[in-house]
Amino acid sequence: MVYETSYESGRKPFKPDLHRGKWEKPTDYIYACFGLALKLDSFVVSYWFFFDMGLFGILPYYIYMALYLVPILVIHSFMGQFSSSGFISAFRVSPFFKGMGYVSLALSLATLLYYSLFAFVPLIFIMHSLRPTLPWSCEGISSWSNESTICNMTNTQVHTLLDSRNKWETFEMTIVRAPSVIFFKKYYEVTSQPVDESYILSWHIVGFSFAIWALITFIFYNFSETAKFGKLVRYMVVSTLVLLVVCFIRFLFLPGAWDGLTHFVKPRADSMVNGTRAMLIIVLQAFGSGWGTVIALSSFNNFKTNVMKYNWIIAFGQTLVYILFGMVTYMLDNYFKTIEPKDFSSYVLKNWVSYLSGASALSTLEWPNMWTIIYFTMMLMASLIVMITQLFTVFTSLFDEFEVLRMYKKKVIYGVLGLLSVFSVLLCSNHGVRHLTALSADSLISHSVMHLLLLLAVLWVYGRERFQRDIEFMLGQPFASWKVFILRFIAPLFLLNSLLISIIVSSFEHLLFSMAIYISLFVLLPVLCIPGYGVYIMCKNTGGFCNRFRRACRPNDWYPVEMEDRQKYEEVVGNADITHQLYEVTEEVN
């Protein structure tokens, strides 16, 4: 394969952003990737479809981690670190596939809309925890609600209710709600009765949503520089994990907590079976909601950073986060099981146990206001870490790809945040929540397809030998051929399996809606944009079809940004593979 510069291909030359900066500490890359494990919608999806897995359900994760998570992390980090550019410009390695970068941009922005839900829900509980009496506690709910909850449903009352409701029925079941679920539900209620009230906005939620985006804007106003941002994320991740451990220790004293932990660590064959499916989904969460997040984060590494070692640390660290969150969720879930009566058919409805129902369990602790604030502050920080990290990679990729935007960085950042805050209002209705949260499941399909295309672009189109040579040059150490074999032949098999599981999960999300419309909007259209952009690149080339296709697939301005590394790379590659001296492309920089 022949290398080309932009001048020879007729395209605008790539000019690196010399002011993009580097991490203050090399480990900031690790902390930022740890933050991706706090993507809490993955816990919601896996718990809903594959609940009751326990610790042994996570064991298949280690197999997947070795066979395709870490290898694909290496591909992502190689593209970002070698090119020192975001997830759009990094596809100079094969411009035909550059549409993947734009699809990643669209996925990042779209998923940020629904992910704000995971931020403003904790904020609601934090603000109301400042009251002297928690409104969802057994004492507080009696002042504003007469509904039957776990607080006022005695055995006698339940038997009476069963007799009155099931007089002519043979099946007897009573559904009892947690007070915190009823409390949150009232924020979506409206006083009028329109034809379809699910489309009516909850103005309480709108206010909290704008508060979240205002907080994010404040963060980027003060921490938009790479070194400052990395330091902020480092402290936020450490603080979040410390609060998570504190909550874990305190929850050990909840009724039924030890039973829940025992059930969590108990070996069960069905856990392994469920884990083989669920972990295929969880593994994909390591790359963030927008797929290209790791590419952009690794672009701030020094050129010789040993990402092989870092990626193993990231994979094991993310697993630890999953286990901690899993144990906390099990303890909260088992608390409600202990208060369910044993002598009749009744069930405590645990909506979104980590968020909504969990607040009722916290209200039973000593100093409930303090523990509620601590727990939901941890959840809020986890959501903010995911959101600001993803936004940071979006802005970085935009500025790397579009040179004209670099002059207006602040305006672009505030403009994008303003638009996202406006469109996130769609989440402030029942209709919006039901439809936009389906993006989480739909994005799993897109991620699996794009991982497969990435392997095709780097290991088959760019070539196995060239990839192996480049990563050895970057790391300064050998990269074994068996690792390349796993990437080319083993990892795609697991990705195809994860694609199948993702399609099944997505179909469940769309059972009540028009599946054809949503699949076309969030899955098919983004995937079709990738070859569409490739055709666009071919049209800009000259010659016959085959010649146009070959030139569209050739690496274009693919070299290290730093002059010293670039000249060494030219010597390694040799003039036989390069049609133009690499350093001439950015001669004006020096």
Regions inferred by a protein language model and the residue ranges of each:
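Juxtamembrane transmembrane-helix boundary signature
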Residues: Y31-F34, L38, P60-P95, T111, ...
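Hydrophobic alpha-helical segments and their helix-loop junctions in multi-pass secondary transporters
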Residues: I72, Y115-T133, L241-H263, M331-D333, ...
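Flexible loop linkers connecting adjacent transmembrane helices
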Residues: T5-P13, V45-L59, V74-Y102, P122-S142, ...
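Membrane-embedded translocation segments of transport machinery
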Residues: V2-K25, I30, T226-Q390, T396-V425, ...
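Terminal cytosolic tails of multi-pass membrane transporters
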Residues: V2-Y3, D17, W460-A480, F513, ...
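C-terminal membrane-solvent junction of multi-pass transporters and transport-like membrane proteins
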Residues: F402-L417, D442-I503, F508-S520
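Hydrophobic, membrane-embedded alpha-helices of multi-pass small-molecule transporters
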Residues: Y31-D41, T111, S116, S164-E189, ...
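Extracellular/lumenal N-termini and interhelical loops of multi-pass eukaryotic membrane proteins
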Residues: S116-E197, A257-G260, V265-A269, I339-S363, ...
